[in-house]
């Protein structure tokens, strides 16, 4: 897992990124069309006990809860690594072959403000709701193709293929088991 980067893709094919490729603490996390940029790529850093910090490739900062908030609608932003649980996440596989990403501190899921799927939609946390707005596909970035803006196993259809779904499920199991076994990159 160490050194591997992923995109966090919504059901419509857009991905989470750092807004305006800003390197400062507090820069928002938003949805945008995939273009292969490093501010759209994330590494899962083992935080122990099945928890993960999600670190941006470009900025080196973690997805965090704005102001450490825990209520529905708290926006996501990036922040330098801390020891706080506001930067810790668990991964939960879904029947659709995607993954829900739950914050440990708030016990809420990564979601989009107003269920918006347009470029620039702000990411937030929200209680569990059925449906695709909280379901994400974690796609490994092919290191050789990353600069060319291509994903490993890229498909035109935003629905995951059986092969992508299997890879997704394998990845979530691998991340979950690595976190419990304290293998992989340490927090």
Q: Each PLM stretch: what is its role?
A:
Residues 1-23, 41-70, 88-117, 135-187:
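Extracellular glycan-recognition/adhesion modules and their associated mucin-like linkers
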Residues 24-45, 68-90, 113-130:
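Short, tandemly repeated low-complexity microdomains enriched for cysteine and small residues
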């Amino acid at each position: 897992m160490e050194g591997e980067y992923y995109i966090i893709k919504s059901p419509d094919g857009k991905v989470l990124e750092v807004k305006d490729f800003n390197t400062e603490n507090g820069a928002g996390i938003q949805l945008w069309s995939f273009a292969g940029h490093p501010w759209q790529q994330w590494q899962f850093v083992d935080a122990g006990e099945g928890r993960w910090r999600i670190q941006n490739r470009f900025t080196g900062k973690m997805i965090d809860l704005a102001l450490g908030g825990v209520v529905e609608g708290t926006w996501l932003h990036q922040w330098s690594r801390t020891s706080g649980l506001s930067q810790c996440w668990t991964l939960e596989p879904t029947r659709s072959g995607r993954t829900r990403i739950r914050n440990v501190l708030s016990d809420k899921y990564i979601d989009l403000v107003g269920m918006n799927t347009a470029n620039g939609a702000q990411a937030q946390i929200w209680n569990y709701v059925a449906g695709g707005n909280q379901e994400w596909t974690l796609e490994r970035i092919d290191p050789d193709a990353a600069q060319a803006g291509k994903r490993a196993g890229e498909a035109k259809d935003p629905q995951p293929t059986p092969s992508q779904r299997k890879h997704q499920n394998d990845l979530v199991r691998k991340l979950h088991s690595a976190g419990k076994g304290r293998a992989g990159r340490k927090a």
